[in-house]
């Protein structure tokens, strides 16, 4: 359901926790998210990526909830060992599952971090000098690009007004290259 049938709104309020679920796409974004403390719930890999992403799979398996990948009947399936399930499918099946052709070969469902107020963000930063405010930016691509630019420019925090697109939707996360998890 997480990769196929649920809308971004449904993911946000998913049963997993009070915080919901987000989907990170690409090895780089998944690695940044894990490094920033997000909890993976499952990993979906293209079959052709299994060998090249072996380090990522090992890293996910090494996490406290890690699972186990097993090959069977000419394709790879998953066994969850009280951990993170890792699903491996051919490219065409992943495209059919997620509903679009661009997947970068790696998708990871992750527990969504709790939203913080502007006060909570600013109180958590000891030496804030540069703050960007996004107001009324409703396109996920633009929000992701703004987050990526903010990181490149050394902005200390980015505040989004309620009229902005959710910065944790799949497209915004992908375009930000994971910086949405790094810049408060």
Language model features: what each stretch is:
Residues 28, 35, 62, 68-69, ...:
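RNA substrate-binding interface of SAM-dependent RNA methyltransferases
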């Amino acid at each position: 359901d997480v990769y196929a049938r649920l809308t971004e709104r449904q993911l946000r309020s998913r049963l997993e926790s009070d915080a919901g679920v987000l989907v990170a796409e690409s090895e780089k974004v998944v690695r940044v998210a894990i490094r920033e403390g997000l909890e993976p719930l499952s990993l979906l890999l293209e079959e052709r990526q299994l060998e090249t992403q072996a380090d990522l799979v090992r890293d996910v398996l090494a996490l406290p909830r890690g699972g186990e990948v097993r090959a069977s009947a000419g394709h790879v399936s998953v066994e969850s060992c009280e951990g993170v399930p890792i699903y491996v499918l051919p490219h065409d099946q992943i495209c059919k599952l997620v509903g679009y052709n661009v997947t970068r070969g790696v998708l990871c469902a992750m527990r969504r971090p709790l939203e913080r107020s502007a006060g909570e963000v600013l109180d958590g930063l000891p030496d804030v000098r540069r703050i960007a405010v996004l107001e009324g930016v409703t396109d996920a691509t633009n929000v992701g690009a703004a987050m990526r630019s903010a990181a490149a420019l050394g902005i200390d925090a980015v505040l989004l007004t309620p009229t902005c697109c959710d910065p944790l939707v799949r497209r915004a996360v992908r375009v930000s290259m994971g910086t949405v998890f790094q810049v408060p």
